[in-house]
Curated annotation (Swiss-Prot):
Belongs to the gastrin/cholecystokinin family. Keywords: Amidation, Cleavage on pair of basic residues, Hormone, Secreted, Signal, Sulfation. This peptide hormone induces gall bladder contraction and the release of pancreatic enzymes in the gut. Its function in the brain is not clear. Binding to CCK-A receptors stimulates amylase release from the pancreas, binding to CCK-B receptors stimulates gastric acid secretion. The modification Phenylalanine amide is found at F103. The gene is CCK. Residues 21-44 are annotated as: Disordered. This is Cholecystokinin. It comes from the Eukaryota. Residues 21-44, 107-115 form a propeptide. GO terms for cellular component: axon; extracellular space. The modification Sulfotyrosine is found at Y97, Y113. It is found in: Secreted.
Length: 115
């Protein structure tokens, strides 16, 4: 059923795209009529398309996302950097805790740290 819905959606998009394209005229009446038709087209080409603006914004957004994804730390070094960025008054320095408490271990309130 999912495949059928996707197929219908694809066909609808293709049909809408085909209907949106201008139809070429089979019998031109003369060079004057052809020039009259080309003049508005030239004006339309000179006007910036509104559709290009969202595409440009989307492209810029994707470029920033890719740059951030490349700069993002990964692996063990990112865990160490996260540990170093913790507040110095944070009493638990074990990398396994990272702000949460395992019920199998002694709680931070019960244990007095010497540091």
């Amino acid at each position: 059923m999912n495949r059928g819905v996707c197929l219908c959606l694809l066909m609808a998009v293709l049909a809408a795209g085909a209907l949106a394209q201008p139809m070429p005229h089979a019998d031109p009446t003369g060079p004057r009529a052809q020039q009259a038709e080309e003049a508005p087209r030239r004006q339309l080409r000179a006007v910036p398309r509104v559709d290009d603006e969202p595409r440009a914004q989307l492209g810029a957004l994707l470029a920033r996302y890719i740059q951030q994804a490349r700069k993002a730390p990964s692996g063990r070094m990112s865990v160490i950097k996260n540990l170093q960025s913790l507040d110095p008054s944070h009493r638990i320095s074990d990398r396994d805790y990272m702000g949460w408490m395992d019920f199998g271990r002694r709680s931070a309130e019960e244990f007095e740290y010497t540091s």
